[in-house]
Structures are given as C-alpha cells and as structure tokens.
C-alpha cells in the first residue's frame, strides 16, 4: 500500500505538471477565485520561497541522499511502523521524487498552484509534490511530538 501511494503521488504530480506546461506556460495566470486562487506557471530553480536559486546540483545530491536514506529506513522498519508513519514516508518519498524528476528533466521544478492570502499576500507558487512533502513533514513532526514514531536504525 505504501509503495502504491508513493507511485500514485508521483504520477499525479507529473501529470499535473505536464498539464501546467501545456496549458499554462507562457500564458497569463488562470484565475479560479479572484484575488484568492489561480493557476500560474512558474519555473522554480530554487527551493521553497525561492531560496537557493540556481543550485541544481546541490538539490539533486541532497534529494537523492534523502530519498535513499528514507527509503532504506522504510524498508528496514516497515513491519514495525504504524500506518501513519508509513503514510508520512509515502508522501515524503512521492513528493521528493516528483520534484527530483523535474530537476533532472528540466533543471527546475514546475510550480503552478497559487494563492493570495490576507492583504493580498502572494503565497509562493507550489505543486502537488510540495503539498505531499509539507503534509508528510507535519505528520511526521506530529508523530514524533506525541511519541507515536520510534526512530531506530
């Protein structure tokens, strides 16, 4: 189940990015809810919030190391992990893999989901992989805080 969820996240992420490239690239943002939600094509050559721009090699090495470490941990401890820990790892691996594929293929990550928050603050544009990574991080932090996640190696 964990592997299937990981693959589903990667497929959904990559298909949504292909659609963004086809229908949003070189076009005005597609407004869904005025002054709140739009689809806007962005080529992100950095990390979250645009930090570390043009550090492709760095991101490839770090992402690959994280994917290897987390995957090995998951395989080694699969039988003792609870379902929420497995969910967190599936989301993390799926999201990281989706953005990793972009960095290898294009040299940047395709982002396209855009929200304007209070006082028209433009929240950084993101994608499905980013959502999976953020949700996994929140879930894993929650599990660690409430002692539902055992770290063993």
Q: Where on the chain are the PLM-derived regions?
A:
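Alpha-helical transmembrane bundles and membrane-interface segments of multipass inner-membrane proteins
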Residues: 1-153
């Amino acid at each position: 189940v964990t592997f299937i969820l990981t693959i589903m996240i990667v497929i959904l992420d990559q298909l949504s990015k292909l659609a963004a490239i086809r229908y949003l690239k070189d076009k005005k943002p597609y407004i869904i809810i005025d002054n709140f939600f739009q689809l806007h094509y962005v080529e992100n050559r950095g990390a979250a919030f645009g930090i570390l721009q043009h550090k492709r090699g760095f991101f490839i090495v770090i992402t690959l190391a994280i994917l290897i470490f987390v995957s090995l941990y998951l395989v080694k401890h699969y039988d003792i992990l609870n379902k929420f820990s497995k969910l967190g790892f599936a989301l993390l691996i799926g999201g990281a893999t989706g953005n990793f594929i972009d960095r290898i293929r294009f040299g940047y990550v395709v982002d396209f989901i855009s929200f304007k928050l209070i006082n028209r603050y433009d929240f950084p544009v993101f994608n499905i992989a980013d959502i999976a990574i953020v949700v996994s991080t929140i879930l894993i932090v929650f599990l660690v805080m409430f002692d539902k996640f055992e770290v063993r190696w």
